């Protein structure tokens, strides 16, 4: 009987862990990206902001709203082009007292990998405040966040994709070719 009670307790505990591991999305709040100093997209989901490329005023605004960590998915080539990004983002973020995490994604040199997702999860876990995740127009950021919801927050892939589409995930090219929505299954 004693082992049976331990077994029941363990099963109950594991079921609670599964329930609490799922991300509760209170809402996806779309903000005025241009007015706040961001390119194309700015949304808030709980303690995470997802956006396109921030201007300095955008970073200032998010710092005032409690953002302490900025995760940038743009490549070095993108970030070093002063015609595209007219300031040194990493240095500016440092001057604001915020943490800068660079996970470049895009092209053969910076492929989408499980390691990139692991780095993002670590950045989220280590953040002591709100987090900004950004790329150029929030497309890569939407994809990374969607994968994060599946791998680390227990959402099924179709639910995560629907949430990602509310930001800037877009449609799968296959859906455009076939002119219909595709449903994916986890294996």
Q: Model regions: which residues?
A:
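A phosphate-binding catalytic loop at a beta-strand-loop-alpha-helix junction
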Residues: 132-142
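Bacterial N-terminal signal peptides
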Residues: 8-18
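Cys-dependent protein tyrosine phosphatase-like superfamily
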Residues: 22-131, 146-187
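Bacterial N-terminal signal peptides that target proteins for export
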Residues: 1-8
């Amino acid at each position: 009987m004693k082992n049976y009670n331990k077994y029941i307790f363990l099963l109950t505990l594991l079921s609670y862990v599964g329930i609490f591991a799922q991300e509760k999305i209170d809402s996806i709040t779309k903000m005025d990206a241009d007015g706040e100093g961001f390119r194309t997209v700015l949304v808030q989901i709980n303690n995470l902001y997802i956006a396109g490329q921030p201007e300095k005023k955008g970073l200032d605004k998010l710092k005032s709203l409690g953002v302490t960590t900025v995760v940038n998915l743009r490549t070095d080539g993108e970030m070093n082009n002063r015609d595209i990004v007219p300031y040194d983002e990493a240095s500016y973020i440092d001057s604001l007292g915020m943490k800068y995490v660079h996970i470049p994604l895009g092209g053969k040199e910076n492929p989408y990998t499980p390691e990139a997702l692991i780095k993002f999860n670590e950045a989220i876990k280590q953040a002591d405040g709100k987090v900004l995740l950004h790329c150029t127009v929030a497309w890569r950021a939407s994809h990374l966040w969607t994968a994060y919801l599946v791998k680390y927050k227990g959402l099924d892939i179709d639910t995560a994709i629907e949430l990602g589409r509310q930001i800037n995930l877009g449609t799968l090219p296959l859906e455009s070719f076939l002119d219909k929505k595709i449903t994916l299954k986890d294996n």
